């Protein structure tokens, strides 16, 4: 149940703060990619798909990741702009799930993040026709050579490459307990605002 005296914004800020605390603890472990999570989407045909993405930003506006918009995930999000992102931190025995409605980030946001990427990753975004069939590895390497020669200096952001923001409707925190009596808490946005409650494990 929602704590007495806490307004909706305060509850939401508490949820975000707790996720950031988990991420900080994860960064202190030997996890190679502490911001890696499984993104689940569902397409027009009703079939789900899941894949690993990197959480690049988390603030009041939501959780941001970047990808090729022509990929399967991009196509599914165009058809059904809802997603769940699950981050599992094995060394901590903790997990975070963020569910929400998905919207594209602004072009300026995408440009800022693109400028931070290493050159090979930028070239790869041009060379890879993500999620499309590939005849051979040689085909991909040939496209990489072609874009290397096309962009000898600055690599512009491809029009098909951008970011998505999951605007949360729920944030769930899980931590392992003895006898599988785990601790589960959910922050959820309803018609009257954000609330916080426990869940049975």
From Swiss-Prot:
Q: Which Pfam families match?
A: PNP_phzG_C (PF10590), PNPOx_N (PF01243)
Q: Which UniProt keywords apply?
A: Flavoprotein, FMN, Oxidoreductase, Pyridoxine biosynthesis
Which Gene3D superfamilies does this chain map to?
Answer: Electron Transport, Fmn-binding Protein, Chain A
Extract the InterPro entries matched here: Pyridox_Oxase, Pyridox_Oxase_N, Pyridoxamine_oxidase_dimer_C, Split_barrel_FMN-bd
UniProt catalytic activity:
pyridoxamine 5'-phosphate + O2 + H2O = pyridoxal 5'-phosphate + H2O2 + NH4(+); pyridoxine 5'-phosphate + O2 = pyridoxal 5'-phosphate + H2O2
Binding, FMN: 51-56, 66-67, 72-73, 95, 130-131, 174, 184
- From the UniProt record, give the pathway where this protein acts: Cofactor metabolism; pyridoxal 5'-phosphate salvage; pyridoxal 5'-phosphate from pyridoxamine 5'-phosphate: step 1/1; Cofactor metabolism; pyridoxal 5'-phosphate salvage; pyridoxal 5'-phosphate from pyridoxine 5'-phosphate: step 1/1
Q: How is the cofactor bound?
A: Binds 1 FMN per subunit.
Q: Give the matching NCBIfam families.
A: pdxH, PRK05679.1
Which HAMAP family does UniProt cross-reference here? PdxH
Subunit structure, interactors included: Homodimer.
Q: What does this protein do?
A: Catalyzes the oxidation of either pyridoxine 5'-phosphate (PNP) or pyridoxamine 5'-phosphate (PMP) into pyridoxal 5'-phosphate (PLP).
Protein name according to UniProt: Pyridoxine/pyridoxamine 5'-phosphate oxidase
Q: What's the encoding gene here?
A: pdxH
């Amino acid at each position: 149940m929602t704590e007495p005296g806490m307004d909706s914004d305060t509850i939401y800020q508490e949820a975000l703060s707790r996720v950031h605390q988990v991420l900080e603890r994860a960064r202190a472990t030997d996890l190679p990619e502490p911001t890696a999570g499984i993104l689940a989407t569902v397409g027009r045909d009703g079939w789900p798909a899941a894949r690993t993405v990197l959480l690049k930003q988390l603030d009041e506006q939501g959780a941001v990741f970047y990808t090729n918009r022509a990929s399967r995930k991009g196509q599914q999000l165009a058809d059904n702009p809802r997603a769940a992102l699950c981050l599992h931190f094995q060394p901590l025995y903790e997990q975070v799930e963020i569910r929400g409605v998905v919207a594209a980030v602004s072009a300026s946001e995408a440009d800022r993040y693109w400028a931070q990427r290493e050159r090979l990753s930028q070239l790869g975004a041009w060379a890879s026709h993500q999620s499309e069939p590939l005849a051979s590895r040689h085909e991909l390497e040939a496209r990489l050579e072609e874009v290397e020669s096309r962009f000898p200096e600055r690599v512009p952001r491809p029009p098909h490459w951008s970011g998505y923001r999951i605007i949360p409707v729920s944030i769930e925190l899980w931590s392992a307990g003895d006898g599988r009596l785990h601790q589960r808490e959910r922050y959820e946005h309803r018609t009257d605002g954000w609330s916080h409650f426990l869940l049975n494990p």
